[in-house]
């Protein structure tokens, strides 16, 4: 099985919260696509609660679009990581990490402004696969934890696992 890019970086050295360019590629028409790792939690030490990450998923995508789309950037998708330590964001364009970090912080401020669970988009049986698994309070706790800390930049070069280590791990 091919080794995915996300498994070639050393998760024991990742900082959080932090932005990392996880992958860049071009479409057949030459459009740049960038995938960002938005790491909310230190891997293997912190994890977002399932109700909070689910609510954040509903809020974060719209708020990030409000703050990041434009000037050659259009978000395709923002999805939570299965490990519940962050989100992957795929977009058209190549914004730098600081622009992404600034938009992320602004989006977290927006999460804190939501006053009632009824304001969560698509929170109904028709548009959400587990519409009862939400917590605005947990989502706002996550947002506060991001805003209380500096959003850093994780570098692929600094986090790259040496080839010897990958071989040792039988990858």
From Swiss-Prot:
Cofactor note as given: Binds 1 Fe cation per subunit.
Domain of life of the native organism: Bacteria
Q: Which GO terms describe its molecular function?
A: iron ion binding; S-ribosylhomocysteine lyase activity
Q: Does the keyword Lyase feature in the UniProt annotation?
A: yes
GO biological process annotations for this chain's record? quorum sensing
Q: What is its EC number?
A: 4.4.1.21
Q: Which UniProt keywords apply?
A: Autoinducer synthesis, Iron, Lyase, Metal-binding, Quorum sensing
Q: Which SUPFAM superfamilies match?
A: LuxS/MPP-like metallohydrolase
Q: Which residues form a coiled coil?
A: none
Residues annotated to bind Fe cation: 54, 58, 128
UniProt cross-references to InterPro entries, sorted A to Z: LuxS_sf, Metalloenz_LuxS/M16, S-ribosylhomocysteinase
Which Pfam families does the UniProt record give? Answer: LuxS
Q: Which cofactor does it need?
A: Fe cation
Keyword Isomerase present in the record's keywords: the answer is no
Q: Which cysteines are joined by disulfide bonds?
A: none
- Signal sequence range: none
Reactions this protein catalyses = S-(5-deoxy-D-ribos-5-yl)-L-homocysteine = (S)-4,5-dihydroxypentane-2,3-dione + L-homocysteine
Quaternary arrangement and interactors, per the entry?
Homodimer.
> Main role?
Involved in the synthesis of autoinducer 2 (AI-2) which is secreted by bacteria and is used to communicate both the cell density and the metabolic potential of the environment. The regulation of gene expression in response to changes in cell density is called quorum sensing. Catalyzes the transformation of S-ribosylhomocysteine (RHC) to homocysteine (HC) and 4,5-dihydroxy-2,3-pentadione (DPD).
**Family affiliation:** Belongs to the LuxS family.
| NCBIfam families (UniProt xref) | PRK02260.1-2
Output this protein's name.
S-ribosylhomocysteine lyase
Report the source organism.
Shigella flexneri
């Amino acid at each position: 099985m091919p080794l995915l890019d996300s498994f070639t970086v050393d998760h024991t050295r990742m900082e959080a919260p932090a932005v990392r360019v996880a992958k860049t590629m071009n479409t057949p028409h030459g459009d740049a696509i960038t995938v960002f790792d938005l790491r909310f939690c230190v891997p293997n030490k912190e994890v977002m609660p399932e109700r909070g990450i689910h609510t954040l998923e509903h809020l974060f995508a719209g708020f990030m679009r409000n703050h990041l789309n434009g000037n050659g950037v259009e978000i395709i998708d923002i999805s939570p990581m299965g490990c519940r330590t962050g989100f992957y964001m795929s977009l058209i364009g190549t914004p730098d990490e600081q622009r992404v970090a600034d938009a992320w912080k602004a989006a977290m401020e927006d999460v804190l402004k939501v006053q009632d669970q009824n304001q969560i988009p698509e929170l109904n049986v028709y548009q959400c696969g587990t519409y009862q698994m939400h917590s605005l309070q947990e989502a706002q706790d996550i947002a506060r934890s991001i805003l209380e800390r500096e959003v850093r930049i994780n570098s692929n070069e600094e986090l790259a696992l040496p080839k010897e280590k990958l071989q040792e791990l039988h990858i």
